[in-house]
């Protein structure tokens, strides 16, 4: 029997995600059980990389290195946007505390040609703060933080999703290290000396001296 356009699209998305998983040390996924040879309609996507979160009782913004998003490809997909639900703590202007994800213009004007692997690329860029919008936030506190903070360099993870293709995937030894899931993003210590020479910024180190009137710079 000839497959419907939707089934063909679901099958194409599944193959694209399998290929993406081969090309990325960041992404993995699980699928809901399917009947017979039907392609998956529901995914639990796991991203392993640096993102940010903040506990409700704390003012500290923390690093988190594992993120899970559920993606449900409803009956109207790909004509309509998939249902997205964030399942792990995250601190981002465009993701609400309850896990609702804002994709900007895609939320009101969904593009059926946007494939599932491309959507995962967008989600990864949100996690690492390469992509965020502070003007129409779902999390106002995160938007205010993103606009005013100067302590954290963004994006917090420089790797593209297809990091194996880009040649920046971690080595086996690095990958074996336990993930850092809650490291306080504290303000860095005040730099010793910062010289500005034209457009070039040069860091210098202050070396202690027994004479308080003398400051050595290396």
Ranges and model annotations:
Residues 1-65, 76-218:
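UBC/E2-like fold recognition across ubiquitin and ubiquitin-like conjugation systems
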